Amino acid sequence: MAGNCSWEAHSTNQNKMCPGMSEARELYSRGFLTIEQIATLPPPAVTNYIFLLLCLCGLVGNGLVLWFFGFSIKRTPFSIYFLHLASADGMYLFSKAVIALLNMGTFLGSFPDYIRRVSRIVGLCTFFTGVSLLPAISIERCVSVIFPTWYWRRRPKRLSAGVCALLWMLSFLVTSIHNYFCMFLGHEAPGTVCRNMDIALGILLFFLFCPLMVLPCLALILHVECRARRRQRSAKLNHVVLAIVSVFLVSSIYLGIDWFLFWVFQIPAPFPEYVTDLCICINSSAKPIVYFLAGRDKSQRLWEPLRVVFQRALRDGAEPGDAASSTPNTVTMEMQCPSGNAS
């Protein structure tokens, strides 16, 4: 079927399955972690439909997050992070949806190849932007909870917007260099350049971003446990941060195993690339569900507006009845922050 012939992750088999495809098409389909696979058969044709359905659901969810966090809910330092995170996830899902649509039909030729190439570039850039935002969220949340007084007194007013802008530019720069050597130059580039770029991106992802998001979360868990022993409720925002980091770590297990086995031990990856892509799409689609589950009130049997649910998910600081707590109410501190902390 056409969907099998045009699957992006199996460039090594495309010329065999579809003789009309050029070598340039094989280069354009290359992306991060396109490595040698144990399984050489193309994925089932139904995979494209699963991708499309999952991406559409994720686009709806992230679109709601963008609307409510951007226009209906008062801006807070952490809502700005979640706003940019939803933007990155939405763009990633859109790029995957476009590729899935092209794979479902008989779209061959230079223009569909160009669309696939642009979609992969956008997907790689937004994927790294979303991943790089998680350490920033984890670190800032950990500092704001453990050292609240110092944090809110020393924190620059536009820190969230500045960090997000810096991470977007960093992701664009890194992925531009990677795509230049691995996609545009192709065989004209030195043989080891693209390989070194893949290794560098993997090190950046697994040995820098992951520890920077895990260690603050561990400190946050210890702090939450201490509060639980003192019978103090933890802020819902803590649950949101821990949940989105956990979802990413679980969904990136296959990606990490493939990368580690291939680049460290030169062992062909046991998991096909469409499986790792599917896990990343699940990660990008799951965050709105995390906000909803964290913000819903179990005591409310009737339907609540989504704006109220999302706003409750961002609840920070001491709950009612914790007035005696020595931890300052960071809700009040956030309300005192100027609303100009825009993205």
Swiss-Prot record:
Q: How does it sit in the membrane?
A: Multi-pass membrane protein
A Pfam family of the record is 7tm_1
Similarity field: Belongs to the G-protein coupled receptor 1 family. Mas subfamily.
Give the function comment from the record. Orphan receptor. May bind to a neuropeptide and may regulate nociceptor function and/or development, including the sensation or modulation of pain.
- Extracellular compartment residues: 1-44, 105-123, 182-198, 264-273
> What GO terms are given for molecular function?
G protein-coupled receptor activity
Principal location listed in the UniProt entry: membrane
Parts of the chain that traverse the membrane: 45-66, 83-104, 124-144, 161-181, 199-220, 242-263, 274-294
Superkingdom classification of source? Eukaryota
SUPFAM superfamilies, alphabetically? Family A G protein-coupled receptor-like (SSF81321)
Glycosylated position list: 4
Is Membrane one of the keywords UniProt gives this record?
Answer: yes
Q: Which gene encodes it?
A: Mrgprf
Q: Which organism is it from?
A: Mus musculus (Mouse)
InterPro entries the record matches: GPCR_Rhodpsn, GPCR_Rhodpsn_7TM, MRGPCRF, MRGPCRFAMILY
Protein name (database record): Mas-related G-protein coupled receptor member F
Give me the Gene Ontology terms describing cellular component.
nuclear membrane; nucleoplasm; plasma membrane
Q: Which cellular compartments is it found in?
A: Cell membrane
Keywords, A to Z, come to: Cell membrane, G-protein coupled receptor, Glycoprotein, Membrane, Receptor, Transducer, Transmembrane, Transmembrane helix
> Which regions face the Cytoplasmic side of the membrane?
67-82, 145-160, 221-241, 295-343
